[in-house]
Amino acid sequence: MTGDRSGLEPSLVKDLRRTNLAHLLAISGLHMGLLVSVMLLAVRTLCLLLPVFITRLYAKKIAAFVALCTAAVYLGLSGGSISTQRAFVMVAVMLVAVLFDRRAISLRSVALAAAILLLLRPEALFSPGFQMSFAATTALVVAFLWWKDSAFQSRRKAVNWVLGVFLSSFVAGIATAPYAAYHFNLFSHVSLPANMLSVPLMGILVMPCAVLSFVLMPFGLEAFGLFGVRLGLEWIAKVALYFSGFSNATSEIVTPQPWVLPVLSLSVLVLFIWRGRFKWMSLVGISSVLLGWSTAQRPAVLIDQDAALVGILTKEGRALSKERGAGFIAEVWGQNDGLLLNHDEAFGLWQSVNMTVKHHWSKKNHGGPVHCTAEEIHVTRLRHAISGDCIIFDKAYLSAIGAIAIWFGEDGRISRIAHAKPPTVKKLCTPRKSGRYKNSQ
């Protein structure tokens, strides 16, 4: 209830991520929205039961004010993480709109919340949480504004509730899927059924019982509310365990070019918000994104900035130059490639590929002379005497310039080299004391 996840088992966290239920862990828009909804319903019902006419007249505004205060208190209790701050701003804009007799759920409210957050934290624009939150919120607002006036609604409230749950889970999943694939290189095939079986329970059981436990806490009776919370969370854990057990529950997605996500976001916004024939031009942008993502080319060679690991891309996955060590880097490379292998398998590929890339990291041959040819790339963590016409990257040079990615052309020659630390004016004007990138021809 306060965002503390230290007691969770790593296996459970992994199951939640594979089923796209990890958003239930962080205090974000879902939790804040459910809390505010519970408070709005409870306070407004209480006001309507009171015999005072003026209280009934302003029941909606009183409930909105109490819900706003509750959200502010919850923000403080949870520690005020960035995701919680973002959620608070979003619900605060909605509740203030209610206080001033404005429409609470609208695209203007979403835009205002985004503007406030970007004024407070401009760097949030590039964070996955900000992008996914506002993608889901914008999509849900557009979907429910359409649903409100559509002919698909039933006269039965129960049927509309079920359809609403399905629609919200489907729309939010579709809206956040490209951002999750871009940032986390993972697409969950079981996200929709897992969320449909879990998210409604958060609103029906977990959050109301959590609010009840807070109310009963001063009297030492919070166990009654926490019992319902435990039942709901146990159900969610079982759902995550069941769906994550499928062999094809997830797929690794290759990282596309940086322009893909901005073009996709702008194109979708134009398609669903713009009025007029011009909006159909956004389909060109969406088509280019799909083409660019499907033809994304990963680097043939990746070199760690400490010269501790080298990876060569093969059809089976990325071959790694060491049997162990630099595990986090190897995992990130595999996720970005969309072909995640364990370290032993990746090292086995290194033994079988016909390599023009050599990695000198073992101290057994420390300082020994090495001769190279023009077709080879040598990466050395140690002080080797390397002679020849090859390209050499040593530890000192990599520490200064950052990790390196290399692409080859159709003729087998290097077509592009990119590094993690682009040279600044200061770096260009300051002579390098040690390290080398040598290409003697």
Positions of predicted regions on the chain:
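Glycine- and aromatic-enriched alpha-helical transmembrane segments of multi-pass membrane proteins
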Residues: 131, 163, 247-301, 306-308
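Aromatic-rich juxtamembrane segments at the membrane interface
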Residues: 1-87
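Extracytosolic and intramembrane catalytic regions of membrane-associated proteins
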Residues: 313-441
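Alpha-helical transmembrane segments
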Residues: 29, 33, 62-66, 87, ...
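Generic recognition of flexible, low-complexity loop/linker segments
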Residues: 122, 298-300, 366-367
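Internal transmembrane alpha-helical bundles of multi-pass membrane proteins
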Residues: 76, 80-264
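Hydrophobic, aromatic-rich transmembrane alpha-helices
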Residues: 37-45, 213-214, 265-273
